[in-house]
């Protein structure tokens, strides 16, 4: 396993669209291991492959919950709720900053696992935010593109209205 360098927000690679993974081989499995090690070392809960400089549609997530460590290869959101929520987000590629972002309250993600099987997972509340945030990276979008200019009180009021 090896730590990889996290690309920062001014790196042009973060604005590029990642490519589908065609074959899950030992190299892909090594990249995934390195991504987890890098994510844990930097105290993150999610990491997209582009954040370590490779344009591959791979995301790793570990929210320390019942789903445990997740590897999502070629993920896509196939369902999302009309109901929205606003939550605070940060990013390992944008250190020292955070901001409020509106995202669907619930999403269903279809992806390929490390064994080549198609899977589906539902994320609600903060997990939905995490899925959307990481999948945005695969399309060259940073959370900072979506930040709302709201106070904490405004966010609480808006979330309670829903």
Curated annotation (Swiss-Prot):
Any one Gene Ontology molecular-function term assigned to this protein's record: metal ion binding
Provide an example Pfam family for this protein.
Pep_deformylase
Electron transport as a keyword of this entry, yes or no, is no
* Record's keyword annotation contains Metal-binding: yes
Q: What class of enzyme is it?
A: hydrolase
Its recorded reaction(s) are: N-terminal N-formyl-L-methionyl-[peptide] + H2O = N-terminal L-methionyl-[peptide] + formate
Gene3D superfamilies xrefs? Peptide deformylase (3.90.45.10)
Q: Active site annotated at which positions?
A: 134
Recite the UniProt keywords alphabetically: Hydrolase, Iron, Metal-binding, Protein biosynthesis
**Taxonomically, which superkingdom?**
Bacteria
A biological process (GO) of this protein is:
translation
Per UniProt, Fe cation binds at 91, 133, 137
Q: How is the cofactor bound, in the record's words?
A: Binds 1 Fe(2+) ion.
- InterPro entries linked to this entry: Peptide_deformylase (IPR023635), Peptide_deformylase_sf (IPR036821)
UniProt-listed CDD domains: Pep_deformylase
- Its EC number is 3.5.1.88
Q: Which cofactor does it need?
A: Fe(2+)
Q: Which NCBIfam families match?
A: pept_deformyl, PRK00150.1-3
The entry sums up its family as follows: Belongs to the polypeptide deformylase family.
What is the purpose of this protein? Removes the formyl group from the N-terminal Met of newly synthesized proteins. Requires at least a dipeptide for an efficient rate of reaction. N-terminal L-methionine is a prerequisite for activity but the enzyme has broad specificity at other positions.
Q: Under what name is this protein listed?
A: Peptide deformylase
